[in-house]
């Protein structure tokens, strides 16, 4: 008996699962995540209401926003959530479809694993299918003229129709297009569109959504420092600083020993002279506005006010950069180094308005702003947050088209066209790999199928007729009308998606499926007993599933 004792290699606290059990566990986890998100696809999508740990409410149908709030335990589910974030950062749209596709790719693979097919065979078939998917997409894509405003609005509209903001779609499309066109920047033949940095969304509760607009310039939530300063200036000369207009304390807070009273008065006098000198350096350039990221002392305010200069202090660094881009000023670190060409003269108007209880500074009517602020008004914070998320998506879509002006038909049409191409190609294939290859084509149909399901139409009947349609010549633009659940030509309906978004969606979905199929072992460590006691109140540990 002694020889048959089991040998313990792993520590007793660890739990190990391997083989088929792990694979089916991963596939189920991915399917669960995909099922949560499935109803959020298309124009007839449902909303999800999430309570975050702080008790705040998030209402959204944006795939990435939902998954960000969900807390999961299974490692495979975590990687699914990660891909939606990647998609959001990379192209800003398609977060819902990428999760649904990845879930479906894994779901169709389960059948082959049950038949004892080796995961590597499935993976290589998936890889081949991905290459063919990419080439088919490029074949059916059409170039677009980015200067054609109506066409651009149409593209953005297709992305917006699935969101809450679709009720105000023409307003939202115009806002997104204007904002992106404003921050577009070409240098040495290289296009740069940085929405995150230079197109800021400011949400102010109150008013109605129709009051929202794009400002040709910048808005900041600040008031002037001194009540007697001007609040309405036409064609202002703007000076931007990132140093404070206060007396410099010694860097190491040096102590000074004073023996006579005159010394103390002299020190105070020096402080005043220093501040006066700073202000004179600035006033020499005859600016109308001084904006600084740091503080302004009372004395400096007094000097500036006497020179009829408006001062604004403690502005965020990002806002300062935006003001610099909008009015053509340079941010200066030392007032004594100010020169004439550091002054921004590109703004047409500086105005300080009171909205609700707060004061806002508007720097608008800029001649050639390379930064802008989108001002959103609306009934409540929740609605504003959702509208902001939707606008971000719309701006990303617009940015993708400007950077890569290629389009593919929306509404599940490109998925069906690619699926049809894969099915045709699989007929010429021999060997075991043809089955998983064909399954990829099957998995792609999940997008039109979900669109049909979400608007409550008959899935089987419509999918069959859509398949039949795609076997005919020149019918690759036929898809599902998400509003009514009927089959239509997307060209006529005007529903297009940027090629960049589609390519990223397919690549990410297949890569994730491949990654999760590769896993055949999960070793999870237990928490130590002490940690266990501390966390009794929280959720159970990952090791104790």
From Swiss-Prot:
GO cellular component, one term: cell body
Cross-link (Glycyl lysine isopeptide (Lys-Gly) (interchain with G-Cter in SUMO2)): 15, 248-249, 381
UniProt region (Disordered), positions on chain: 1-24, 526-545
Main location: cytoplasm
Modified residues (N-acetylmethionine): 1
Keywords, comma-separated and alphabetical: Acetylation, ATP-binding, Chaperone, Cytoplasm, Disulfide bond, Hydrolase, Isopeptide bond, Magnesium, Metal-binding, Nucleotide-binding, Phosphoprotein, Ubl conjugation
Disulfide bonds, paired cysteine numbers: 366-372
Segments passing through the bilayer: none
Compartment(s) where it occurs, according to its Swiss-Prot or TrEMBL record: Cytoplasm
UniProt binding sites for ADP: 42, 94-97, 162-163, 411, 482-483, 497, 502
Binding site for Mg(2+): 93
GO BP terms: binding of sperm to zona pellucida; chaperone mediated protein folding independent of cofactor; chaperone-mediated protein folding; positive regulation of telomere maintenance via telomerase; protein folding; protein stabilization
Phosphotyrosine modification, residue list: 247
PTM-bearing positions, type Phosphoserine: 11, 170, 243-244, 252
EC number(s) on file: 3.6.1.-
EC class of the enzyme, as a word: hydrolase
Phosphothreonine sites (modified residues): 430, 459
Pfam families, A to Z: Cpn60_TCP1 (PF00118)
Reaction catalyzed: ATP + H2O = ADP + phosphate + H(+)
Residues at which ATP binds: 42, 94-96, 411, 482, 497
One example GO MF annotation: unfolded protein binding
Assembly and interaction partners: Component of the chaperonin-containing T-complex (TRiC), a hexadecamer composed of two identical back-to-back stacked rings enclosing a protein folding chamber. Each ring is made up of eight different subunits: TCP1/CCT1, CCT2, CCT3, CCT4, CCT5, CCT6A/CCT6, CCT7, CCT8. Interacts with PACRG. Interacts with DNAAF4. Interacts with DLEC1.
NCBIfam families registered for this protein in UniProt: chap_CCT_gamma, thermosome_alpha, thermosome_beta
Family: Belongs to the TCP-1 chaperonin family.
Purpose of the protein: Component of the chaperonin-containing T-complex (TRiC), a molecular chaperone complex that assists the folding of actin, tubulin and other proteins upon ATP hydrolysis. The TRiC complex mediates the folding of WRAP53/TCAB1, thereby regulating telomere maintenance. As part of the TRiC complex may play a role in the assembly of BBSome, a complex involved in ciliogenesis regulating transports vesicles to the cilia.
Name this protein carries in UniProt: T-complex protein 1 subunit gamma
Organism: Rattus norvegicus
């Amino acid at each position: 008996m002694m020889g048959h004792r089991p040998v313990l290699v792993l520590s007793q606290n660890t739990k190990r699962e391997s083989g088929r059990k792990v694979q089916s566990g991963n596939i189920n986890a991915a399917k669960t995540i995909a099922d949560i998100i499935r109803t959020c696809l298309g124009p007839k999508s449902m909303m999800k209401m999430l309570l975050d740990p702080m008790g705040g409410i998030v209402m959204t149908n944006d795939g990435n926003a939902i998954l960000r709030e969900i807390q999961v335990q299974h490692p495979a589910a975590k990687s699914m959530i990660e891909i939606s974030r990647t998609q959001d950062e990379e192209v800003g749209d398609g977060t819902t479809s990428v999760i649904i596709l990845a879930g479906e790719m894994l779901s169709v693979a389960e059948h082959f694993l049950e038949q004892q097919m080796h995961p590597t065979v499935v993976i290589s078939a998936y890889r081949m299918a991905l290459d063919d998917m990419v080439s088919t997409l490029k074949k059916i894509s059409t170039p677009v003229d980015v200067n054609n405003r109506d066409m651009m609005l149409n593209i953005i509209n297709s992305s917006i129709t699935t969101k809450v903001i679709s009720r105000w779609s023409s307003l939202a499309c115009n806002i997104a297009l204007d904002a992106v066109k404003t921050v577009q920047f070409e240098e040495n033949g290289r296009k740069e569109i940085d929405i995150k940095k230079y197109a800021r969304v400011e949400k102010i509760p109150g008013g109605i959504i129709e009051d929202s607009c794009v400002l040709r310039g910048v808005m900041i939530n600040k008031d002037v420092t001194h009540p007697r300063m001007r609040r309405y200036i036409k064609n202002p000369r703007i000076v931007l600083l990132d140093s404070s207009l206060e007396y410099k304390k010694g860097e190491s807070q040096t102590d000074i020993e004073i023996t006579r009273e005159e010394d103390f008065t002299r020190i105070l006098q020096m402080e005043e002279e220093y501040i006066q000198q700073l202000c004179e350096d600035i006033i020499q350039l005859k600016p109308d506005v001084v904006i600084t990221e740091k503080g302004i002392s009372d004395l400096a305010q007094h000097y500036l006010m006497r020179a009829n200069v408006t001062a604004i202090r403690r502005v965020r660094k990002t806002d300062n950069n935006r003001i610099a881009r909008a009015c053509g000023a340079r941010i200066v670190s030392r007032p004594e180094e100010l020169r004439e060409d550091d002054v921004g003269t590109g703004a047409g108007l500086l105005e300080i308005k009171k909205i609700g209880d707060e004061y806002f500074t508007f720097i608008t009517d800029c001649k050639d702003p390379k930064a802008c602020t989108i001002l959103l008004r609306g009934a409540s914070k929740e609605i504003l947050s959702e509208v902001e998320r939707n606008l971000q998506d719309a701006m990303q879509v617009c940015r993708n088209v400007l950077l890569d002006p290629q389009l593919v038909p929306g509404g599940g049409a490109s998925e069906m066209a690619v699926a049809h191409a894969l099915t045709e190609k699989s007929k010429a294939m021999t060997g075991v790999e043809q089955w998983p290859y064909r399954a990829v084509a099957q998995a792609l149909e999940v997008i039109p199928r979900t669109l049909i399901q979400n608007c409550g139409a008959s899935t089987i009947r419509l999918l069959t007729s859509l398949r039949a349609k795609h076997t005919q010549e020149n019918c690759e633009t036929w898809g599902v009308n998400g509003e009514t659940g009927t089959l239509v030509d997307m060209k006529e309906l005007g529903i297009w998606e940027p090629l960049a978004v589609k390519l990223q969606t397919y690549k990410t979905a297949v890569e994730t499926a491949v990654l999760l199929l590769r896993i055949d072992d999960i070793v999870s460590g237990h928490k130590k007993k002490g940690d266990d006691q501390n966390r009794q109140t929280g959720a159970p540990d990952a090791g104790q599933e």
